[in-house]
Every structure is written in C-alpha cells, then in structure tokens.
C-alpha cells in the first residue's frame, strides 16, 4: 500500500512518533519518503542484506527473515519477522522504528536523513 503524506502523518502522530526522541513528524515523513516512497511493501536488497517496508528496516539486525540466504545470524532486535514489515499494518513498523531511533545513531541510522531531511522541512508539513 502506498500511503498519502497526510494520512501517514496522522497515523505516525496517533502512534507517538511525532517528536519521539526529538525527531519531528516532518523529519519522519521526509525519511520515509526517501527510503520507501511511502510504500509499505517496499523491499530492497543491498550487500547481502534486505530492507523492509516504509522505514526500510534492515535484516539481519532488526528483523528475522527465515527465507533469507544470508549467512549472518539474525539478531532480530525488534523481535519481528521481516514479512510483518511488508504488510499494511504499520503499527509494528512504528514500534521497531522507535527502537532504532533510541540507539546511539538516532535518526542518522536512516541514510536519507543527512542529505535530505535535516534542514528545510516545510514541504513535509500537513
């Protein structure tokens, strides 16, 4: 499912992501746009790992992909199958993103943040 920006903004806000760990809704909307194009089914492969869903949450560290050919054991820090990050229910994705942003790298764990989302965020307001 591809979300519309203001619909996604409302869902993120209702589930406590706006301002969570100092990250604004606009920053999240910008990051999610650049990571997945607001597509809850986005799946990308890079360097032997895979990234899943709206937030492009990475396997093997954050989720477990039982079908993966990765030789690295899964840490599964979010305690979730990667397939659950590819459905239209994004509440589990949001909870995992909260765990990620609380890590030392914070929002910079998402590579899109630095080049695209750390300055003028007016276009991401709803």
UniProtKB/Swiss-Prot annotation:
Instruction: Name the Gene3D superfamilies on file.
Output: 1.10.530.10
Q: What is the lineage of its organism?
A: Eukaryota, Metazoa, Chordata, Craniata, Vertebrata
Pfam families referenced in this protein's UniProt entry, alphabetically: Lys
Glycan-carrying positions: 47
Q: Which residues bind Ca(2+)?
A: 84, 87, 89, 92-93
Give UniProt keywords alphabetically: Calcium, Disulfide bond, Glycoprotein, Lactose biosynthesis, Metal-binding, Milk protein, Secreted
Give the record's GO biological process terms: defense response to Gram-negative bacterium; defense response to Gram-positive bacterium; lactose biosynthetic process
- Species the sequence originates in: Ornithorhynchus anatinus (Duckbill platypus)
| Function summary | Regulatory subunit of lactose synthase, changes the substrate specificity of galactosyltransferase in the mammary gland making glucose a good acceptor substrate for this enzyme. This enables LS to synthesize lactose, the major carbohydrate component of milk. In other tissues, galactosyltransferase transfers galactose onto the N-acetylglucosamine of the oligosaccharide chains in glycoproteins.
Give the UniProt subcellular location, in the record's own words.
Answer: Secreted
Name of the protein described by the UniProt record: Alpha-lactalbumin
Which residue ranges traverse the bilayer?
Answer: none
Q: Which family does it belong to?
A: Belongs to the glycosyl hydrolase 22 family.
Assembly behavior: Lactose synthase (LS) is a heterodimer of a catalytic component, beta1,4-galactosyltransferase (beta4Gal-T1) and a regulatory component, alpha-lactalbumin (LA).
Which top-level group of life is the source organism from?
Answer: Eukaryota
InterPro entries according to UniProt? Glyco_hydro_22 (IPR001916), Glyco_hydro_22_CS (IPR019799), Glyco_hydro_22_lys (IPR000974), Lysozyme-like_dom_sf (IPR023346)
Which cysteines in this chain are paired by disulphide bridges? 6-126, 30-117, 63-82, 78-96
Tissue expression profile of the protein: Mammary gland specific. Secreted in milk.
| Stored PANTHER family | ALPHA-LACTALBUMIN (PTHR11407:SF32), LYSOZYME C (PTHR11407)
Q: What is its main location?
A: secreted
One annotated GO molecular function is: metal ion binding
Name all C-type lysozyme domain ranges: 1-126
Q: Which SMART domains match?
A: LYZ1
Enumerate the SUPFAM superfamilies for this protein.
Answer: Lysozyme-like
Annotated gene: LALBA
One GO CC term of this entry? extracellular region
């Amino acid at each position: 499912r591809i979300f519309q920006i203001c619909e996604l903004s409302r869902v993120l806000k209702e589930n406590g992501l706006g301002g969570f760990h100092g990250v604004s809704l606009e920053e999240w909307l910008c990051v999610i746009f650049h990571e997945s194009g607001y597509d809850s089914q986005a799946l990308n492969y890079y360097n032997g790992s895979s990234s899943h869903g709206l937030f492009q949450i990475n396997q093997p560290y954050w989720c477990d992909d039982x079908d993966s050919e990765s030789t690295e054991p899964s840490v599964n820090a979010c305690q979730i199958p990667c397939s659950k990050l590819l459905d239209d229910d994004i509440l589990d994705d949001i909870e995992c993103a909260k765990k990620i942003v609380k890590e030392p790298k914070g929002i910079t764990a998402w590579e899109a943040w630095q080049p695209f989302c750390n300055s003028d965020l007016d276009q991401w307001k709803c």
